[in-house]
Amino acid sequence: MSKALASPAKRFFVEMLTRDIELADAILDLLDNCVDGAIRVGPKDAALPYKGFHAHIELTPSAFKIDDNCGGIPRNIAENYAFRFGRTERDRDANLATVGVYGIGMKRAIFKLGTNCVLESKHAADQFTVTIDKAWMENDGPDGWELEL
């Protein structure tokens, strides 16, 4: 039996994902992720659960940078979940009061902000870098949705 290709064209998918979000809201999605990361790390002080955490934003005409200390992305989450579009694990974080709901905020923000992104994550003793650039966007081949860590 033959098969028909039914995967989305990447450019179409990205345009649909970002068409209804303003740039400021995309940045707020990234800050939501910082808040969720701090929640996952756990409060150091129950009365002030975000004490000691920060998210610094740097914006220039040619670049946007957010630097935080909110826990990073665990490698297994990056490999299997964080860069997927939408939640695959509905019960993940069910016991936490996280802000994120749909699993698209970071990706939508990255695509809204521009065509070149370098994401560096440090979680516990592990760290990795992910690059999403024009070459990745233009690759609609069978492995086109994969990202190198």
Where are the model-predicted features located?
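Bergerat-fold GHKL ATPase/HATPase_c domain
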Residues: 1-52, 76-79, 83
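Short helix/loop capping segments that flank catalytic or ligand/cofactor-binding pockets
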Residues: 39, 74-76, 122, 128
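Glycine-rich/acidic phosphate-handling loop/turn and adjacent ATP-lid/helix
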Residues: 64-95, 137
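Glycine-rich, histidine-containing beta strand-loop boundary motifs that form or position
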Residues: 30, 68-70, 77, 120-123
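Short beta-strand/loop element within the Bergerat-fold HATPase_c
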Residues: 49-61
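Alpha-helix N-cap/helix-initiation motif
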Residues: 16-23, 67, 71, 91-102
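GHKL-type ATPase core
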Residues: 93-149
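Conserved, well-folded catalytic cores of nucleic-acid-processing
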Residues: 20, 33-37, 85-89, 112, ...
